[in-house]
Amino acid sequence: MQNDQGEIVDVYIPRKCSATNNILAAKDHASVQINMAEIDPQTGRMTGKQITYALCGELRRMGEADDSVNRLAMKDKMLSEVFGH
């Protein structure tokens, strides 16, 4: 398919799980997408930076979603390292 500038683009780009890197199937109704916003410590307001994490249903079913979000947030410096220990 071509866009209005004549560039070839894909119609569908599948999402991947941020923790396991598995492709999220269309029928994976247990998968979720979480947006985390950075907060300014002085004002308590959002700075405008946000990161999106997609988690597959298999990860949630195993009960590993919370650990995965914490690990991803620490890697992206959205959560302090002290929280992990």
Curated annotation (Swiss-Prot):
Predominant subcellular localization, coarse grouping: cytoplasm
Molecular-function GO terms, alphabetical: structural constituent of ribosome
UniProt protein name: Small ribosomal subunit protein eS21
Taxonomic superkingdom: Eukaryota
GO CC annotation terms, alphabetical: cytosol; ribonucleoprotein complex; ribosome; rough endoplasmic reticulum
Chain coiled-coil ranges: none
Keyword Ion transport: no
Subunit-structure text: Component of the 40S small ribosomal subunit.
